[in-house]
Amino acid sequence: MERYESLFAQLKERKEGAFVPFVTLGDPGIEQSLKIIDTLIEAGADALELGIPFSDPLADGPTIQNATLRAFAAGVTPAQCFEMLALIRQKHPTIPIGLLMYANLVFNKGIDEFYAQCEKVGVDSVLVADVPVEESAPFRQAALCHNVAPIFICPPNADDDLLRQIASYGRGYTYLLSRAGVTGAENRAALPLNHLVAKLKEYNAAPPLQGFGISAPDQVKAAIDAGAAGAISGSAIVKIIEQHINEPEKMLAALKVFVQPMKAATRS
């Protein structure tokens, strides 16, 4: 959890926002997935948002569903994902690592056991995509017991009550949704979100990172100009993996070419 605080403090000092890529663990296979994550970090990623493959991903558009299917085809299990997380943490001791997942995967393990395992491998935050704030108590309590930040999604139509709850219960960062619907780079982020950012700040919420539909440097810059602490990009990155699925080296080179200008756009 503290890794987010240190990161945001360092970025503030350098007058930069955070660029955070999302990928599915084990896509397109364990070995290449680990190389992808190393490449994203080398190219400038400030933190990681990682998915554990799940059979019924509600909030994901087709791009990320395909990533999940590729990981399944490679035989990737949740247990192997945790082994990967331990390796990533060993290699990159300071980068914040967040998980984006679904409640069933948490229930399968048992809520407390799941967060204990997160703590053990060095995961900093968990966003459970299909658990609304009002049902989050058992998740967020277990998370805090194990020094894992519970992350909440702030939708574009959030009312005052919801903003206060998010500010009160969330730690690490706040996932600021560009728009309603499923993930996907085709659906460009609708800005500005200034009013939400201002309210979150007023209620002392964890720093907002804007996600959903972030696929170009100008969107990263716009998110930061609107007051967000940074931007999360998922579908655009996963699409690059898909496009170069049979050319692992080209894939890594293309990811680097995508991430560098995205990170550059966070510098004011």
Swiss-Prot record:
InterPro entries: Aldolase_TIM (IPR013785), RibuloseP-bd_barrel (IPR011060), Trp_synthase_alpha_AS (IPR018204), Trp_synthase_suA (IPR002028)
EC category name: lyase
SUPFAM superfamilies referenced in this protein's UniProt entry, alphabetically: Ribulose-phoshate binding barrel
Pathway: Amino-acid biosynthesis; L-tryptophan biosynthesis; L-tryptophan from chorismate: step 5/5
UniProt xrefs under CDD domains: Tryptophan_synthase_alpha
Gene3D superfamilies noted in UniProt: Aldolase class I
Active site as annotated: 49 (proton acceptor), 60 (proton acceptor)
EC annotation from Swiss-Prot or TrEMBL: 4.2.1.20
One Pfam short name: Trp_syntA
Gene Ontology CC annotations of this record: cytosol
Annotated catalysed reactions: (1S,2R)-1-C-(indol-3-yl)glycerol 3-phosphate + L-serine = D-glyceraldehyde 3-phosphate + L-tryptophan + H2O
Domain of life according to the entry: Bacteria
Keyword annotations: Amino-acid biosynthesis, Aromatic amino acid biosynthesis, Lyase, Tryptophan biosynthesis
GO molecular function list: tryptophan synthase activity
Function: The alpha subunit is responsible for the aldol cleavage of indoleglycerol phosphate to indole and glyceraldehyde 3-phosphate.
Assembly and interaction partners: Tetramer of two alpha and two beta chains.
Similarity comment: Belongs to the TrpA family.
Name recorded for this polypeptide: Tryptophan synthase alpha chain
Taxonomic placement: Bacteria, Pseudomonadati, Pseudomonadota, Gammaproteobacteria, Enterobacterales
